Amino acid sequence: MAFLPKFDSAGLVTCVTTDAVSGDVLMVAHMNDEALRKTIATGEAWYFSRSRNALWRKGESSGQTQRVVEMRTDCDQDAVWLRVEQRGAACHTGRHSCFYRKVEMAGEGGARLVFVDADRLFDPAAVYRK
């Protein structure tokens, strides 16, 4: 059976990335055809930045890399799931996961954010020179 990803109108597939050991969701990103091919060829996670309109290898700026342990696709082949060995933080904010805020539903349609697992593993200002 062939892997034939179905890219959206922008040429992207959604990628969910989890820690191969803990199962924690680390991040959700996007891949274009080139990012997908480079990920398969190198065993390192490559993504496509919609905001920068550019291909990027996870960790090329921060050193916080992802080695792919397993790649899966969903039933429609329009999304992929990477199980990775995360070295350092996955989030550009310096946190282990991009999902470091819990949404507490306050009733009456209201909600608020509460920080969980919010410790920083690195200082993004120092790493990215922002």
UniProtKB/Swiss-Prot annotation:
**Keyword Zinc part of the UniProt annotation:** yes
Its pathway, per UniProt, is: Amino-acid biosynthesis; L-histidine biosynthesis; L-histidine from 5-phospho-alpha-D-ribose 1-diphosphate: step 3/9
Residues binding Mg(2+) are 74, 76, 78
Chief subcellular location equals cytoplasm
EC code(s) of this entry: 3.5.4.19
Gene Ontology MF terms in the entry: magnesium ion binding; phosphoribosyl-AMP cyclohydrolase activity; zinc ion binding
Q: Which biological process, per GO, is one annotated for this protein?
A: L-histidine biosynthetic process
UniProt keywords, alphabetically: Amino-acid biosynthesis, Cytoplasm, Histidine biosynthesis, Hydrolase, Magnesium, Metal-binding, Zinc
Give Gene Ontology CC terms: cytoplasm
InterPro entries for the chain: PRA-CH, PRib_AMP_CycHydrolase_dom, PRib_AMP_CycHydrolase_sf
Cellular localisation? Cytoplasm
Q: Which residues bind Zn(2+)?
A: 75, 91, 98
Organism superkingdom: Bacteria
Which family does the similarity line name? Belongs to the PRA-CH family.
Q: How does it assemble?
A: Homodimer.
Q: Which PANTHER family match?
A: HISTIDINE BIOSYNTHESIS BIFUNCTIONAL PROTEIN (PTHR42945), HISTIDINE BIOSYNTHESIS BIFUNCTIONAL PROTEIN HIS7 (PTHR42945:SF1)
Question: What is the protein name for this chain?
Answer: Phosphoribosyl-AMP cyclohydrolase
Q: Which organism is it from?
A: Bradyrhizobium sp. (strain ORS 278)
